[in-house]
């Protein structure tokens, strides 16, 4: 602050650790009253995050909120020039002085009211999209629901029993679909895609392709757009941890086997007496692997534990071994983990850098070899009838949609919100919101919970 505190237009210059904190906001208001200030410059983080915060401070201080300037010295200086502290500081000083000069030239403004279109576009007909559409319609907005596939429901529409409530996913989605199709304010378009967007926040015009070639189109005026396109599961490459061998299934394939059959477990006509689960397949991969996913998929530990409980219900005598790196059954889901142990599941912790090895035996069975960290790295061999690869979640690539809506995409392929805590569904494109698994790996319950936010933001 010493670099600018003596500038002729500066009356008060202060520094703070967290400018957005309540204590610092109070100091700003007090200085504005004591010094009879008429404008405000804040040099901190992104205006996308805190413009409204400090406009509110200006109002409470008796200033015109439009005679405030936010100077972004975090993203534009501190984070950008981590290897040049001196240069970053000099740049920050120049930016702050530019902000002061800009503020000196501002004039008081008064907000105006602009009519907006009371209709929302929801992209994606999975469980998050269905719930978002219903939530928006229930507060009186017209909704256009666009689904790329021929049917609604997404991945959850193919699920059987789900945790922790045990409800059937297909039945749950079927009820949601009936509610959506019966609602007078919701228009459902399947086999449809968003082709283009024009206009501005509150008054967008979107073009929807109604056939695969995009020849037949429809245009809708919408005030906001909610993206709920979901995610997909990781597909192992052939040979990865034995994938492609008889008796090696991914977790979704194993779950389908449980949902679609009854009686004693069998695989290819052979009884299943021993199951080995290998965790973190397609998640927490080494950064050097091309196309690898370094993130944790979060939901799959609990999903695997739940599947093991279902298998134990089918055959209480089945032996189940879980080869995990870290067990992340967070919150109340730890109760499922405890229950699975009580029912006989054995959990063996394996090292990050030495994954299990799956071998096909001449007898047709499988053998899984791994080092158990809980026994100081002792190598163990597990004869198994079935190996389940606990696969994670990956982003559903959609370059055309990203281009049409100008969606912000992270390095992991998921769509980015402005801030995970403060603005969890807003994107940098005003009026374009995201919810569900298109943001990050999450289970269906979390996807449904987050869908309530778009209605809050759309209605202000």
Predicted regions and their residues:
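Residues forming the flavin
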Residues: 1-460
